[in-house]
Amino acid sequence: MWKYKVVSPEEVLSKIEPGMAIFLGTGMAEPRTLVKHLMASEEPNLQDLELIQLVSIGDTIPIDERYSRKFRLKTFFSGWIASEAISAGRVDLIPSRFSRIPGLFKSGAIHIDATFIQISPPDENGYACLLGVDVERQAMEAANLVVGEVNAHAPRIMGDTLVHMDEFNYFVESTEPPLYLPRWSVEDIYLKIAANIANVIEDGSCISLGIGPLYEALAVQLATKKHLGVHSPFFTDALMDLIKSGAVTNRRKGVFRGKSSASYLLGSEKMMQWLDHNPLVEFQPEDVITDPKVIGSNDRMIAILPARKIDLTGNVALHAGKGDVTAGPGNVQELFMGAALSKKGRTVFGLPSRNLKGMPNIVLSVDNLPFQFTNRESMDLVVTEYGVAYLMGKTMRERAQALIDIAHPDDRAELVRQAKEAKLIYADQIYFPESGAIYPSKVCCSHEFKDGLKVCFRPIKPSDEDMMRLLFYRFSDQAVYSRYFTSIKTMPHKKMQEYVNVNYHLVMSIVGIVEISGTEKIIAEARYARTKQDAFADTAFIVDEEYHSKGIASYLFELLIRTAREEGIQGFTADVLATNKAMLKVYEKSPFPVQTVLSRGIYELTIPFTPLSELKKRD
């Protein structure tokens, strides 16, 4: 028995008085029929109004100058269509953490006279579904006039969504389709960034995704993960795809276990249909979903955030305008804090190395850019298509080096120059401009060894200098002597930077890395070196003594052989102390014949890469 409350949009608008503050739903909850009539009406009572909307992403609320006498928009989100209008002074931004907004409505700190929201049709018991669980309930309680726009195409979503028709003063039957957002196209560069992000996300992690090409790509690259959880302010098409892939079970979440949890719906018509009566996804209020303490109660909470630019110290400039749909400073801060409170949680900022104009996105400073997020003390990871920069626990110099290593190869030489001038890196820092362009990323791989030890392997980078120094100083005197055939006590910067800067053609170095408490640790290194005239390359290996007898050296040897053969190298040589039985065993496992000569306590090894087909014929 609610039909008697159904009125025309004009009758609803006749109840409005000049100066009133009207709350409007966001996204799927935006009452588009009411808003369109409000914009079109010339009635004199519709003047000097305040329209309050959490996120303005629709096309029904014009924000140009000609409507300034009728209304002024207030929003909590600086992105999407409101960005330029905020800068021009036509829209008011209310800076706030999203989890605090319900409290602002409850306390009256933000006054609301009327609430217009879109809802689903009611069930047989008179209960409709809210389509924006964010703060709509609090907005309804704060207003004297509550109007529901009933849309027959709206889904019935699960969670804290039920609202009885008795709680409304009037209803309007919608003549507009709900607000659908088209999906973003995904370029290869975002698939590469997403693949690098996926490599640092463990099975059982809890994630938060927004809207944009990065998140669309992540839905693809995370599809092979297991037991992921979802705790996200926005529910999107990308999350729908990820759940449908089977990667999400939510079994290891700390809150809302077994369910994906969100507060808003932003997506396509297909997603809305999929959510209809779907028990896998529950929607909860904003002050629950975005509360850092609630976010942090999920172990391994991964906040994946897009960035516009990042500087060499770790400061971030967020996107503005239509480049920013779901990652404004307010909700970025809450996700960031939540991940910091989470056991084994981390934040990941992802961005292409260059923007669409071909300008660098990793720069010396972001001080001249708007929408800065300056919380570099808590930064964890920055990811581009060229790799991952681990920042936690790093010095400013180490951060700068790590970020330069994932910048666009053509931008690195200039970044090195600028960083030297700014005294962020060593004044004598070596940099080979060609090394970035020829970095052999195809060598990168990972392998699980005994006792579940996962080791990632990749070609060495200039930013590995400090980790390689730490590896050197962990070795015993005997290990150093076995590797270098002399007693070396120190490994200063000058010497080590020459060691880690290689050209990848004549000299190849592959490091083995483990991740411990969110930071990288090099535990092994293998390399070959030759001159242009040499057909054979000399080899050497070293493995942290804590990780001996796990097969790491043998695996590195296989990687070196594969890489060398692709470079046209015809074989390996090596000098091994006769007492170094473990290293001799590694070489003996070669698929190729090993020729040995013992001279003065040193085995001189020669390993020609005889075609394997010939070896099989001989057998």
Please give the residue ranges for each predicted region.
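Long, contiguous binding/interaction regions
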Residues: 438-619
